C-alpha cells in the first residue's frame, strides 16, 4: 500500500502537547487493549487516580469494550499533568494512536492529512519554506490497521467536464494536484457566515458550536484583514490541507462537494479568526491565527459529522 502526504506535513512527530489527552473526548477502547492496559496498571507503571478507568459505552461495536474514563476537568485518566506524554503510550487505544492523522483510503492508496487542532500539526503550517507538493511518504502508524474513510470499493467521482462520465484515477490525481497547487484563502467574503452556519449545522447533538460573533464582518475588516497577508504562506498551506484528501469526494457529490467543503473551511477559519481577535481585542498575530486554525479543525474534523458536512451543499441546492 502506498501512502501520500502533503510535504509540509511529513515532519510531523508528537511533541507531547497533551491536547489529545485533555479535550474530554469519548475514546473507545478495543477489547484487545483491555488486558494490555490492565497489565500495565498491575505493574504499577501507571499512577492511576480514577477508578474505574474503563466506563460503559452506549451500543458500542462488538470489538469495543468501553470508553476511557475522564476526570471532572475532561482530562483522560491516564494523563498526568506535568509529565511527558501518555501513561499508556505503548498500549493506548487506536483512537489515540491515529490522532491527529486523517486518512482517505481509495484505490490509489492512503492519502494522509492532519487535524490542525493538534498544536504541533498547526505549527507545521508556519514552518515550511518549500513549495507545496503531494509526496509519497511512510505509513502514519505502525502495522496494517489504518483508520479513516475507506473508499476502496467506491468508483471515482464524475468529471465536471464530461456529463455522466467517471474520472479515471489518473484524472482524479491530476485534479487533486491542481486543487492543491491553486489553493488559497482570501479575506472576508459576503457568504462567510452562511457557510459557517452550514458547518455548525453538521454538528450532531448533544454537541454544539457557538454562533459567529455578532460583529464578525466588522471584526474581520478592522482586526483580521490588516494582518491577513502577513500569513499568506501559512494560510495557503491550510487551504491546501483542506483541498487535499477530501472525504467529500466520496461522501458527497464528488468534485463539487470537495470544492464546497474547502470553501466552508475557508469561511470557518475567517470567522474563527474574527472571534479570536474580538476576544483578545488586538489585531491578528501568529498566536491568534494558530488558535483560529485549531478551533476551525476542532469544528470541521472533530465536531461536524463528515457525511452531513459533505452533503450540505447538495441539500441546499435542493431546498
Label for each model-derived stretch:
Residues 7-18, 147-152, 235-244:
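Short, compositionally biased low-complexity segments
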Residues 45, 49, 53-78:
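Gly/Pro-rich turn-and-neighbor structural signature
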Residues 158-319:
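Hydrophobic, aromatic-lined core segments that form the binding pocket/scaffold
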Residues 1-4:
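Short Cys/His-rich Zn2+-coordinating modules
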Residues 89-180:
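Internal, well-ordered alpha/beta segment that forms a basic, Gly-enriched binding/recognition surface
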Residues 6-58:
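Polybasic, low-complexity association/targeting segments
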Residues 10-26, 71-102, 115-122:
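Local cysteine-cluster metal-coordination motifs and their immediate loop/turn environment
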Residues 9, 25, 84, 88, ...:
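Conserved aromatic-histidine-acidic binding/catalytic patches
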